[in-house]
A protein has these predicted regions:
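Positively charged, low-complexity intrinsically disordered leader regions
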Residues: 1-66, 70
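Phosphate/diphosphate ligand-binding glycine-rich loop within oxidoreductases
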Residues: 42, 46-151, 276
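Phosphate-coordination loops involved in phosphoryl transfer and adenosine-cofactor binding
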Residues: 48-53, 158-160, 265
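Rossmann-like adenosine-cofactor binding region
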Residues: 204-283
């Protein structure tokens, strides 16, 4: 029986987590599970034949590049890869002009850059969907993968508690958006001076008061959590603060005591790359509660579902 799909009638971008609805996420998670199952069974799945993804990197990446590039090829499409060395994004050419040109030659654009404002400007002038591969403010594709990984291992995340330990960065911002949208709670613990910017985290969709709680003690943030997650102490672009951050974050290392305070079946996640002995101890990230390798692989599967959806809509 031939499959049918409902093509997008309006252009849709994925620039932050609030760009999709809870219903759309339910569809994406179900679709990602099916696409992953096909991948594991070596079944071809080529809905994007003759489609081209442009990837623009102003921030270097391993997982983002491999997951998007391999994913697009697995969907039957092709990829154009641009870096700061071979693109003129926002330098010799205005971002608006680059967007108008690139979107006439490709079907989909993924951008990994510094300022959220830059990707917003690009999307406003693009004729094709634009995906946020990471900005200083948000990392929606990673949280998409993290939630999918939780669902794979523990079922629905609705009503659960996620403990965020560390920097109040783009990951923390996006977790807050996701919690408000999908109905779970986030316990956030950061050192003083590195708190989550609540106004930034609110973005377009806002955060609800009952989805967020701040803890000055990271151990208390982990108490009763169903998922404990963290990130590097020093994100890309903040290298000059590295030594200062090592001192400030010394007590924000996820260890066995924090995991013991969480639920007995709590999971540990990290978006990688990880620095063992800094934001997480080796016995945690390499231990039985860690699902970081599934989490990393799932970036590819959820992004395949996302690209398929942005171009083809829902497939029956």
């Amino acid at each position: 029986m031939k499959k049918s799909h409902t093509a997008m009638t309006t252009l849709k971008h994925y620039l932050q987590f609030t760009d999709l609805t809870a219903d759309e996420y339910t569809y994406l998670f179900e679709r990602a599970a099916l696409i992953k199952k096909k991948f594991k069974a070596y079944e071809k799945h080529h809905p994007l034949v003759d489609r081209t993804l442009a990837m623009i990197f102003e921030k270097a990446s391993t997982r983002t590049r491999v997951s998007f590039e391999a994913g697009m090829y697995q969907l039957g499409g092709s990829v154009v890869h641009l870096t700061t060395g071979d693109s003129q994004l926002g330098r010799a050419e205005p971002i608006e002009d680059s967007a108008k040109v690139i979107s006439r030659m490709t079907d989909l654009v993924m951008i990994r850059t510094y300022e959220q404002a830059k990707i917003e400007r690009f999307a406003a002038n693009s004729r094709v969907p634009v995906i946020n591969g990471l900005t200083n403010e948000y990392h929606p594709c990673q949280i998409l993968a993290d939630i999918f990984t939780f669902i794979e291992h523990r079922g629905s995340i609705q009503g659960k508690t996620v403990a965020w330990v560390g920097d109040g960065n783009n990951m923390a911002n996006t977790w807050l958006q996701a919690a408000s949208l999908l109905g779970f709670k986030v316990h956030v613990s950061t050192p003083r001076g590195y708190e989550v910017d609540e106004k930034l985290a609110a973005g377009a969709g806002g955060i609800s008061a009952d989805s967020y709680q701040f803890f000055s003690n990271p151990l208390e943030a982990c108490r009763g959590a169903d998922l404990v997650t963290t990130d590097v102490w020093t994100s890309m672009g903040y290298e000059a603060e590295n030594e200062e951050r090592r001192v400030a974050f010394a007590d924000w290392c996820v260890d066995a005591e924090m995991m013991a305070a969480a639920q007995p079946d709590a999971l540990f996640m990290h978006c990688l790359p990880a620095h063992r002995g800094e934001e997480v101890e080796a016995d945690v990230i390499d231990g039985p509660q860690s699902v970081v390798w599934d989490e990393a692989e799932n970036r590819m599967h959820v992004q395949k579902a996302l690209m398929e959806y942005l171009l083809l809509g829902r497939i029956a």
